[in-house]
A protein has these predicted regions:
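Predominantly extracellular/secreted Zn2+-dependent metalloproteases
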Residues: 2, 25-135, 145-167
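Walker B catalytic acidic pair
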Residues: 141
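Bacterial N-terminal signal peptides
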Residues: 15-22
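Bacterial N-terminal signal peptides that target proteins for export
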Residues: 2-14
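Substrate/cofactor-recognition hotspot
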Residues: 138
C-alpha cells in the first residue's frame, strides 16, 4: 500500500472511531429535562432541601434501612457529608422511556441504590397542583437512591413517613 493510501485508510479509521464514540456516548447519556419538567424538578428540589434543613425531617434517613440492614443515614455518610450535597449529586432525568412512567400515574422512579431519578410526565402537574407532595416525592426517591427498597414498606408508607417528618 502506498503512503497516500495508508494515510487515507488511517483517516477513515480515525473518523469511524470518532463517529462511533460520539454515537455510543450519546446513546448512553441520560435524557436531560427541558422546559416545564426541568423547572418543576428544580422547584421541588429546592423545596425538599428547605424541608431537610429540619432535624426532624432528616430523621427519615434513620427511619429506613437498605436490604443489608444499614440505615440510609449510614449510606448517605459513605457518599457525602449532607443531604443537601447528596441531592445535588443525584441527576433527575427524562423518564419517558421507563415502563412505570408510561403505564401508570407515577411521578418519579428510582432504583434502590442507583443514583438517578427518572421524571415522569405527571411530575410537573403534581408540582404545580401539590408542591408539598412534589417535595415529599423528591425526598422519597432520594431514599431509594440510598438503597431503600419497596414492599415493604409500600410506596404510600414511605411518602406518608416523609410527609409526617418533613412538615
Amino acid at each position: 500500500m502506498s503512503k497516500k493510501g495508508s494515510r487515507s485508510s488511517g483517516r477513515a479509521v480515525l473518523t469511524s472511531a470518532i463517529l462511533l464514540a460520539a454515537t455510543v456516548g450519546n446513546a448512553a447519556a441520560p435524557l436531560t429535562l427541558t422546559g416545564w419538567d426541568r423547572r418543576a424538578v428544580e422547584t421541588a428540589r429546592r423545596g425538599a432541601l428547605k424541608r431537610l434543613e429540619s432535624e426532624e425531617c432528616r430523621k427519615v434517613f434513620i427511619d429506613f434501612t437498605d436490604a443489608q440492614g444499614r440505615t440510609l443515614q449510614q449510606n448517605l455518610e459513605k457518599r457525602t457529608a449532607s443531604p443537601a450535597e447528596y441531592i445535588g449529586l443525584v441527576p433527575f432525568v427524562d423518564g419517558s422511556s421507563q415502563a412505570l412512567c408510561r403505564e401508570t400515574k407515577t411521578a418519579l422512579v428510582a432504583t434502590p441504590g442507583v443514583r438517578r431519578v427518572f421524571v415522569c410526565r405527571t411530575f410537573a402537574e403534581v408540582q404545580l397542583r401539590q408542591p408539598g407532595l412534589a417535595e415529599s416525592l423528591v425526598i422519597h426517591e432520594i431514599l431509594h437512591t440510598l438503597g431503600l427498597g419497596e414492599n415493604p414498606p409500600t410506596s404510600i408508607e414511605i411518602t406518608q413517613r416523609v410527609q409526617a417528618r418533613c412538615r
